[in-house]
């Protein structure tokens, strides 16, 4: 990581902070979920940086990026990503997004067409209207307010207890990201989400949908989406929850590498 760039790009009228591995290699843009940050992708980026120019932005309201007063719907996040791609002059990048970042990647891919090379959706927030309402009416915001009132040591201790099965580095990266997430981004939980059936149908490049055995997107939904778009492949990672790239990083890397090889050969 010592040779990585840490910089800011003006995109969609705000400053987007990003980490970048660099080099004259195919670009790969990694989009984190709500309460994450670009740095949460560091283990995967280390594994891929010999072959890819990996770009890891902090979404608005997260990490070191700007926190505008409003503008926290998926269309806003997507415009930020498009602005980043244009600002950094990334030619035909592959997008990889998790959770909120997965939905954002789907929106971007549906809009940019063949200007991107492929898209990986890691347990994206493809929620039914009822589930969206349940999440919106939950105490997620209050839970985050309470977390922000704790000191760093307490947050890390809670994270280690809750995720004892995860690598210590991953636990710390995710905990640090949570502490740098402001309240405003939780507006993204306000229904309705973009219609994911429409988005997936509109994507014209190869798609990898990575799901967990205990995540958000069910195998039935994945198969339904596969029927909508023949470009979509599905991989299920066992013994993983919604944070599948944290729960099973080695298996996640394998399926990502396999898809990236497929895209490179197409």
Feature names for model-found ranges:
Residues 76-93:
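Conserved acidic catalytic loop of the alpha/beta-hydrolase fold
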Residues 106-111, 117-148:
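Flexible "cap/lid" loop of the alpha/beta hydrolase fold
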Residues 131-136, 147-204:
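Conserved alpha/beta-hydrolase catalytic His-Asp/Glu region
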Residues 240-249, 253:
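Catalytic histidine-centered segment of alpha/beta-hydrolase-like enzymes
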């Amino acid at each position: 990581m010592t040779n990585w760039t840490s910089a800011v790009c003006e995109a969609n009228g705000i400053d987007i902070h990003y980490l970048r591995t660099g080099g004259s290699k195919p670009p790969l843009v990694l989009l984190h979920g709500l309460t994450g940050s670009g740095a949460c992708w560091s283990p995967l980026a280390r594994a891929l940086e010999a072959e890819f120019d990996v770009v890891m932005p902090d979404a608005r309201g997260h990490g070191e990026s700007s926190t505008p007063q409003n503008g926290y719907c998926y269309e806003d996040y997507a415009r930020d990503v498009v602005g980043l791609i244009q600002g950094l002059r990334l030619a035909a990048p592959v997008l990889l997004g998790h959770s909120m970042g997965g939905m954002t990647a789907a929106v971007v891919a549906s809009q940019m067409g063949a200007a991107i090379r492929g898209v990986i959706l890691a347990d994206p927030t493809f929620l039914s209207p009822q589930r969206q309402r349940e999440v919106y009416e939950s105490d997620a915001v209050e839970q985050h307010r309470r977390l922000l009132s704790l000191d760093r040591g307490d947050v890390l201790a809670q994270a280690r207890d809750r995720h004892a099965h995860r690598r210590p580095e991953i636990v710390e990266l995710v905990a640090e990201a949570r502490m740098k997430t402001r309240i405003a981004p939780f507006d993204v939980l306000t229904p309705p989400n973009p219609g994911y059936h429409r988005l997936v149908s509109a994507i014209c490049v190869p798609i990898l949908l990575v799901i967990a055995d205990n995540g958000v997107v069910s195998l039935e939904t994945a198969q339904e989406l596969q029927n909508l778009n023949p470009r979509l492949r599905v991989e299920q990672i066992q013994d993983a929850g919604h944070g599948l790239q944290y729960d099973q990083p080695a298996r996640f890397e394998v399926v990502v590498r396999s898809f990236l090889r497929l895209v490179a050969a197409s």
